[in-house]
Amino acid sequence: MTTPDAEDASPSPEYRSDQDDDMAAEQTTDRQSGDASPTQKPANGKPNAKDPLRPRRKKARRACFACQRAHLTCGDERPCGRCIKRGLQDHCMDGVRKKAKYLHDAPDGSLMPGVGGHYPYMNGNRPTPLPAQDTHTVSVSPQSNMYNQAQPPAAFYPPNSIPGQLPVTQDTRAFSNQQSPISPPFTQAHHASVQNAGAPSTMSQGQQGMQQFGPLFDPSDPALFNFDISSLNFGNHYGALEFGMLGHMSSGAVETPHDNNLMNNMSGSVNMYNQQVPSGYPDQNNAAAMAFGPNGLPGSEWQETQSRQGSMHVHTPNNTSGSGSHDHHPHRNDSLNGPHAFAIGQGPATHSTASPASTDASTYEGDNPLSTAAFFANANRPHAQRSPLVSRPQQENRPPTTALQSIHANGIRKRQRDTKSVYQGITKPYDYVKGYHRLYQLIDKKYSRPWVAKAQQYLQNYRPVLLQVREELNRDDLIHQEMGLQRHLMTLQEHFAEVGTPFLICRRSGEIVGINKEFTILTGWKRDVLLGHEPNLNVNLGTNRESSESDTSTQNTTPNLSAQDSEGATPSVNIIELMDARSALEFLQHFSELCYQDPRGYASQRVNMLRYQTKADVDRIHNMKNASSGDAKLDPLVKMEGGAVHQGESAMQRLGAKSGMVDCMIWWHIKRDIFDMPVLVCMSVMPVLDKGLP
């Protein structure tokens, strides 16, 4: 390097600023007076730098590296005049400009002036490979020391290799020459030294798929996120990388790889993934190659880095390796699972379009080692190396993924119901004849003579049809009918339990089979009493019979069955026992209309529900009335704009406390079985709230 002269100017000792007019930075020209001579020179003989008519040199499109550091002007020629003057002509090269954000992944060569339109990898184009770049197949013999089963010979496409003659004898546990994981420049020369090998190299199919993986986060590798950018024709490569990273984070954040015992010991793993050392290198390098991987990492870290890659190899413009995902399960249903977010465009470079259907994400949780959670949570755990050809038969033996399995895998839980008691515990049909006999007895006991005739007329509208259909069914049909009723009841109870309104479910003959807690609070009827588990001690009958009428009637009375008299089980409470006489008669009328005349209809009516009151409850209420003499003060109500409202269970329990009846509105409809026979009555009960408590 020459000694800087007085004409050089630089912020550092090596580069000094130049005061020559042709090499100095452009200055703002000051307006001179009209009588000033344009050719006038100062006393030192140098031209005036502020002269507007002085010759100007053309501004360079890109300065060289030395001039760029010195913040001086430069020329378009290489080497430039300043570097020649200072003896730096051998090192004169274009300076590196700061890339824009959208040019982050563009190679430096594509940003050279005049090269943008002719750069071979712009706009998704692919250059014609040179003769030295042609990939020739090399026969690969099966590997047997790692996998016991034999593998057919396959074609191996060798990557870029270091020039040199390979030895004839190869260690079967080691790789052949492997390309560096770091992306090479686009002008890297390709060598075909593998073609001149004296003997065919041997490697396993699993090692072949894993040797071509690059680093996980190489920013200069276009195949960073499992798709070939040059084949997408986006135009904005940086945007593609951004969306690829977002999809990578969202699609793999919950996946964790399976932990299995397929890993070999550390020494075997390191020996298996080392690159071959050519014959031109000394033998002492073998020790370093055995301890470190191709990218300079220790053997264990190199193995973990490779385990995070997929098992599908994607070609890129720089001949770097990208990782993809093989379809480990041929029966996967993409319509339910769907491809992962960055699966668009995934696949070999031969695909001209980015179709989500052409790619398949990992079916199982552990098959995606690129997941974010798996990468950070299991950074120090060994991962099993999967070979595409060897693990394929094992994975094909897995059961096919059905729609139900896919839904459960995504976290949607299924209701767990114990249906064995329904399908295995029911061995005989329900005796509706006994139920209707008891219904007739309740009607005769509850109603007066004129009302009994009306109730029997309502029953005659539909019961003959039920008896006719019953004669066409055998015992198995009736058992199946009861199973369907109990199974349907199980579903209805789950649905009504999620709604905070009182509900009631009964058979077509009136027996109660299902209630909820809200109905118990509203009416005071306990669940065990309604279902027949406890004796019914209710004395609040709500009858309209006159005291002069006889308790027993010999006209239109169905005799008791002998089996019914001997039966010791307590029957369920009938629905007409929960209503007063007028409300129960109206219910029977609506049921006769909806049973067959309007099978898909519903009914709503206002009823008086009877509260459950035993003899002790009636005596206590009577004593409280006598003691208070009407002077008892009720609890204060919560005041709102619309008046007083009822708050809590205690307010609901006081409804109908004096009269023994709760004013309600009911809405109900009929459920049918496969024989189109009415089997269940589903009823919602809503109390009619007044402004004040009764």
From Swiss-Prot:
Residues 205-214, 349-363 have a biased composition (Low complexity). Belongs to the ERT1/acuK family. Its main location: nucleus. Keywords: Activator, DNA-binding, Gluconeogenesis, Metal-binding, Nucleus, Transcription, Transcription regulation, Zinc. Residues 485-559 form the PAS domain. This is Transcription activator of gluconeogenesis PTRG_06536. It comes from the Eukaryota. Residues 64-92 bind DNA. One of its GO terms (biological process) is gluconeogenesis. Residues 193-204, 302-324, 392-408 have a biased composition (Polar residues). It is found in: Nucleus. It comes from Pyrenophora tritici-repentis (strain Pt-1C-BFP) (Wheat tan spot fungus). Residues 1-57, 175-216, 289-369, 384-420, 539-569 are annotated as: Disordered. The keyword Protein transport does not apply. Transcription factor which regulates nonfermentable carbon utilization. Activator of gluconeogenetic genes. SMART domains: GAL4 (SM00066). InterPro entries: ERT1_acuK_gluconeogen_tf (IPR050335), PAS_13 (IPR056751), Zn2-C6_fun-type_DNA-bd_sf (IPR036864), Zn2Cys6_DnaBD (IPR001138). The keyword Transcription regulation applies. One of its GO terms (cellular component) is nucleus. One of its GO terms (molecular function) is zinc ion binding.
